[in-house]
Swiss-Prot record:
One of its GO terms (biological process) is tRNA methylation. It holds the Pfam family GIDA_C_1st. Its main location: cytoplasm. One of its GO terms (cellular component) is cytosol. The keyword Cytoplasm applies. FAD binds at residues 13-18. Belongs to the MnmG family. NAD(+) binds at residues 273-287. Homodimer. Heterotetramer of two MnmE and two MnmG subunits. NAD-binding protein involved in the addition of a carboxymethylaminomethyl (cmnm) group at the wobble position (U34) of certain tRNAs, forming tRNA-cmnm(5)s(2)U34. NCBIfam families: mnmG_gidA (TIGR00136). The gene is mnmG. This is tRNA uridine 5-carboxymethylaminomethyl modification enzyme MnmG.
Amino acid sequence: MIYPTQYDVIVIGGGHAGTEACLAAARMGCKTLLLTHNIETLGQMSCNPAIGGIGKSHLVKEIDALGGAMALATDKGGIQFRILNSRKGPAVRATRAQADRALYKAAVREILENQPNLDIFQQAADDLVVEGERVTGVTTQMGVTFKAPTVVLTAGTFLGGKIHIGMENHSGGRAGDPPSIALASRLRELPLRVDRLKTGTPPRIDARSVNFDGLEKQWGEEKTPVMSYMGSLADHPEQTCCWITHTNAQTHDFIRSGFDRSPMFTGVIEGVGPRYCPSIEDKVNRFADKDSHQIFIEPEGLKTHELYPNGISTSLPFDVQMAFVRSIKGFENAHITRPGYAIEYDFFDPRDLKYSFETKHIEGLFFAGQINGTTGYEEAGAQGLLAGLNAALKAQGKEAWCPRRDEAYIGVLADDLISMGTREPYRMFTSRAEYRLLLREDNADMRLTEKGRELGLVDDARWQAFCKKREAIELETQRMRTTWIQPNSAEANALAAKMPAELAREYSLLDLLKRPELTYDDLGSLKGEAVSDPQVAEQVEINTKYAGYINRQTDDIERMRQHENTVIPVEFDYMSVEGLSNELKQKLSEARPETLSRASRIPGVTPAAVSLILIYLKKRGLLKNKAALA
């Protein structure tokens, strides 16, 4: 049957990508349907119970700045918050939250169920309705067809999913959930490049069987941060600690003894695993000279005894898992509640996508999350939001939008995937961003919330809070610029102990704030009243101390933007460009970059090659300055 309601956007999958996608489309006023195989697993954390980390928290903050749910749910479910790289510069500082799985999932579901314009339906999607070269709907397992001009597919690890524990394997989307076999087969019929990837998870351990005596405790920050710009400490549940232990030589011997029954080493698993989150057997094999590897013991929640031993992801046989786990300090009598496993799944080459995350070959079909070759909740959520908002824009007949690399980590993520593709699960790092001093986690709202409001993603409450904060930053900066400290004054004497020399002349508070030895806390209330909002104070301090570097990066960006919007026609013949190597001709013909700027980021494409293409475009009268993402 055909369902009577006509939707604008249909989202398949209720994980981290799917939830952000459907919420974004609904916030923008589109009639949206979320199809999930099980409503009880909406927002489920399939692997580690944590949100954020280096590079990842930047994505979470950007999702939040655009009105998304991930940061809000993290504040509701976070049971430990830490600031990583706290002693380094603001560009690489990152917030990481340990989360209670149940509380996080409940927070996501509450947001979904209270979102206007959003319907949820429990049923697996088996087929896409494609008419000509455009998608027009989705057919479910029981034969119900839902119609919509745009569909966002966020299938996670479910497409052709296969779970491995030792030499045993079975079909599954994750432990306890069936895979999407029919939909995977249907997608393989489409003109899209497909391959296999692999990820894994560690065995879970009953805390009652662990000896915590002698294990190092790891507590959160004394001044607990919030993840969302709209969050507050009052949102946080009870805070708890984690622990640290290590593998040892005996652990490694047990692991090596299972190599002959490892699906990874025997060739049973064909998919490539994540480079930056390797299994314990991979670490022992690759780093044979290391005597031990660190393990973070993380609680799964406040009302469960299960622990997540971060660092020992494995697909070794269960008897080997038991042996090596019990060789680890604190785990001598450990009871494993769930075995570790690896899962292989289909992913599709992201180079077959536009920057809106719409497929190049099937109009109206968008991909987001692990289907695009990424790993991580945060990467999935960022893609989901971008795909969802662009599906909504397409349904509304509007031009697509994608932030540039100098505007957001979401833009870096999209550009990396679509211009270069990936052969292994892609994760975000701050090192991937050329302009990371501008793309800090602390200023994501200053960078993106205004655009989010323009797109219809940001509600009145968030917009008012943003405007109030922005005005407060401007006012406090101006106050400090016009407040002066005289030499030998009481204020100058109060600073003397922190300065290498006495003031020789009059200085404004803003000038003094530029000095590395002084902070906003030292100066804010020195003369007048300091701001009470720590986020405002942080922005004033960072913008002042790093002004020179920020201005330099801004100038670099302006130079790069000269060719940012120089369009390369879709039918452009690279083979005709004299001077380009055959290798570059082949790469460019395959990648089909939409602009000169994006062509320049393809590996091997030099500035000289970009110049040759530009000259060719000028000679043929093909120069255009508006990049059409839609």
